[in-house]
Regions:
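Metallo-beta-lactamase
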Residues: 1-69, 76
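Accessory terminal helices/loops
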Residues: 40-42, 53-127
Length: 127
């Protein structure tokens, strides 16, 4: 809705909630790139499809930053454990790292393991 400066954006940006990252075609790497393109668009508010009826543009940036922070935290935890397949241990380290900034977001504890697992998969595939 250009006149209203509102962007309808579903599934890749749910304000204040970490994403459900377990669909076969989910790619945090590609989502991060897409969110950067969305951030460059001229709009003020989003209609996310999940969560609140609308939210400010800043929520797009917050989700992108979460994905970048998640990727960094997974890499650090993987290095610390020395085992890319220690998903439980890596997830606990990532939760501890990200909890101060994102711990109040919806599904933080419930969906973090699938977020970590998806980042690990992408790293194994060379993203």
């Amino acid at each position: 809705m250009p006149k209203e400066r509102v962007l309808n954006i579903v599934d890749i940006c749910t304000p204040q909630r970490i994403g459900f990252r377990n669909f076969p075609d989910t790619s945090p790497h590609d989502t991060t790139k897409a969110l950067r393109k969305v951030e460059a668009l001229d709009f003020d508010r989003i209609v996310p499809g999940h969560g609140p009826a609308s939210a400010p543009k800043a929520e797009v940036t917050a989700i992108r930053e979460y994905l970048e922070d998640l990727t960094r935290a997974v890499s650090a935890a993987k290095e610390k454990t020395g085992n890319q397949f220690a998903v439980d241990q890596i997830t606990e380290l990532v939760k501890a790292d990200l909890r101060p900034k994102y711990g109040q977001w919806g599904e933080f504890d419930n969906w973090m393991m699938m977020n970590v697992d998806r980042i690990l998969l992408e790293q194994r595939l060379g993203y």
